[in-house]
Design a protein with these regions (language model features):
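Family-specific signature for flavin-dependent thymidylate synthase
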Residues: 1-299
Length: 299
């Protein structure tokens, strides 16, 4: 078995074109089956197409879309577009009004020309489910200082913390699936990987092959944890060898099993996440990751 510490990675988009959006979706979507090795320069569009054919639109939530409209006299169509995103709970709209130096004479008063700029942040699932994709061609843009930003983070944590983090329902989630991942395969080095709890201070990361490799007193409770993880790996492998499917053998896997979790949300969602998960009474393993991520966000 392999023991590692938890970690995270802030995933930056490769760009903001529709092809770049597809790449973000594929990267997140392949986390579930751990099929990232199938990603190529041209695989993203086909991957998204398959997801759409199977109605798996949840993956499209990871395709962040930034739109821009500049209007002086909004048409009925543009007004309808803006109103839709304003009322959509998964989108955010910022309006900036500018006043021109010239003015119009209207009766006895002077009324300055007003131009309104609309900065919209949404995701591809919203566009697809509401038949908005035809409006993307002209309005798609890179994020500006006025756009509400969305951020994507990949956590390497245990299954217990996965359950904690996915309670933040404002986010989009994609997690490594124990139903489909067969950890007895060469792809996973024929072993299970477990997360070292933060309260076990002297256990090093690495591969372990026998119970006796934990050199501590028999009364040390951490030795029991070590033995339980090793036993889980042994039983899991044995069940697979005897014909059980991964979705059946996974029933004996403990919370300490390593998993990968990708989360995408607005900056306000992450601030709420930090408020709860960095609190003194938060679960210590959740706080461990949240504190590290908050420090990175603040830099």
């Amino acid at each position: 078995m392999k023991l590692i510490k938890p970690s995270f990675q802030i995933i930056e988009p490769t760009g903001y074109t529709i092809d770049d959006i597809y790449k973000s979706i594929e990267l997140a979507g392949r986390c579930s089956h751990k099929s990232e090795d199938k990603i190529t320069e041209i695989s993203a569009k086909d991957f998204v197409g398959r997801m759409l054919n199977m109605k798996h639109l949840a993956t499209c939530e990871f395709g962040t879309i930034y739109l821009y409209y500049k209007v002086d006299k909004p048409s009925t169509m543009v007004k309808e577009i803006i109103d839709f995103y304003k009322n959509n709970q998964y989108s955010k709209v910022e309006c900036v009004n500018s006043y021109s130096d010239t003015y119009l004479e209207r009766g006895m008063g002077r009324v300055y020309d007003i131009e309104s700029e609309y900065f919209i942040t949404t995701n591809l699932r919203v566009c697809l489910e509401n038949n908005r994709q035809e409006y993307l061609t002209d309005a798609l843009c890179e994020p500006t200082e006025y756009h509400y930003k969305r951020y994507t983070v990949k956590f390497i944590c245990d299954r217990g913390i996965l359950a904690e983090f996915t309670r933040h329902r404002r986010f989009s989630f994609m997690a490594e699936s124990t139903r489909y991942c067969n950890y007895s395969k060469n792809k996973f080095n024929n072993q299970l990987t477990f997360i070292i709890p933060c309260w076990i201070k002297d256990l090093k990361e690495g591969n372990y092959y026998a119970y006796c490799e934990y050199h501590h007193a028999e009364t040390d409770p951490c030795k029991e944890w070590f033995a339980a993880c090793m036993n889980a790996e042994h039983v899991y492998t044995e069940l697979i060898e005897k014909g059980w499917k991964p979705q059946e053998a996974r029933t004996i896997l403990p919370n300490s099993l390593k998993t990968e979790l990708i989360m995408t949300g607005f900056d306000s969602d992450w601030q709420h996440f930090f408020k709860l998960r960095c609190a003194p009474n938060a679960h210590p393993q959740a706080k461990e990751l949240a504190d590290m991520l908050k420090d990175k966000f603040n830099k």
